[in-house]
From Swiss-Prot:
It holds the Pfam family Glycos_transf_2. It is an enzyme of class 2 (transferase). Optimum pH is 6. It is found in: Cell inner membrane. This is UDP-Glc:alpha-D-GlcNAc-diphosphoundecaprenol beta-1,3-glucosyltransferase WfgD. One of its GO terms (cellular component) is plasma membrane. Its EC number is 2.4.1.305. Disulfide bonds: none annotated. It comes from Escherichia coli.
Amino acid sequence: MDDYLVSIIMPSYNAEHTISASISSVLKQTYANWELLVCDDDSSDNTRFKVLEFSDSRIKLLTNEYAKGAAGARNTALKYASGRFIAFLDSDDIWIANKLEMQISMMLKNNISFMYGNYEIINNNSIVGKFVAPQKITYNKLLKNCGIGCLTVVLDRTLLNPFSFPFVHKEDYYLWLSILKDNNISAINCGFICSKYRLSQSSISSNKFKELKRQWDVLGDFVENPLARIYYLLNYIVIGIKKHAFDYKNGKK
């Protein structure tokens, strides 16, 4: 199974306090045939030096000459990726040790080209919640809500041709929609917690009205009928309210 190279795409920007833990979680993978492509997006702190502290030849540091955002950093890394499979990990998130081994095994055995998983939510290294995604996500289901965490995704690289991350808000969500629609496939949940998503100040204080506007904008590129677009946005709102109510009930305000 280790015959297949996995290219891990990691964008970074001013992540000196978290990127070492993220890279360490890759080094702990029980699946050994990988390359980690870290693309630094013109950081002003010591992020690049933190990456260079690791001597493993599978870790490759790339740099953008000027800040292009997460989409631009991921796209730069994708240009240098040579793996059969593509995985994604941000510079503040963490993988569990058998993530790649389990997911690649399931994908090969079941002919799955798009896999994601469940993840824990951490804040200051403490677990504050978890996200359990649907077992299968179709294109129409994805239009209602993005249940796919980028940090959990593994793709067959053929799905990315001709796609890359667009320079829009919610760029990962936009890419998943493009892939599922163009290939007429469903994404499949591996069924276990494979990653840890670290809450950042931006995610904690995100403006819900801005998120609604961004969701509306993304839907505009995929749903022509205005009434259908409203339908999908209402689904997005209802799912968000249910999630907020669940979090409030469980003390995760």
